[in-house]
Amino acid sequence: MNRRNKIIIILVIVIIVGIVAVIANSFLSTPTLTLGDKNILVLAVDKNEQSGGGLDMAFMVELDNGTIANYTPVYPGGMTHPTKHALGGLSGPMMLHDCLWDGPEQGMEYAKEIVEYNTGMHADAVVIIYDDGLDAIIDSIRPLKVDGVVTNLSSVDIVRQNDNYAGYAGRDSGITGNMSRGDAVLVLVKALSEASKDPIKKDTMTKVAIEEYSKGNIVMSPSGSFIKLMATKGFESLS
């Protein structure tokens, strides 16, 4: 996967932490996530990388009585399933990166098992967002106002303006930002959050999210609550 797509995956997963704040509320009427500490495993997937998509980044989002309390990055590199062999003719144990080979439903279960085996963190629900899905949501509310200034820059370029990340192979020496990659991404997240306060943009984001869910670019387990949630609450908890 090329550098641009890897940055997109980083953007996807951090923004999805905010979207999960909305999604999580949809489970509050069910007994499994209503009370106590619960976890949602959020998977960022490059849909066209391989069969089923390549899982490039994940976060475990921790809920405290339905409110996001924390999130923990889960880096797929080196994480394997305790008992399953690799799918698709690959050799060795099943890797977290490749667990979606046979499709999202089975893949989400494999992802839960792999993450729990390797980290001890149990997931009560799983959300997949493919890069196509979040790209569409981001693009639907351009131009963004970043730090009070309207910009038509791409999400990747917004991050590049602010970060000082020099560790990626091939990165040129023209580093102009003074932030960590995480903080630079949060600049974009804040911009999207502010955009969602505009009722028209919020409605647009909600509509696109529902469309992307219908296209299969956002997948949830347990399923069935996303459309109802987005139709009623939209992206309010991002604000």
Question: Which positions does each model-derived feature cover?
Answer:
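Non-catalytic, solvent-exposed segments at the cell envelope interface
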Residues: 2-13, 18-239
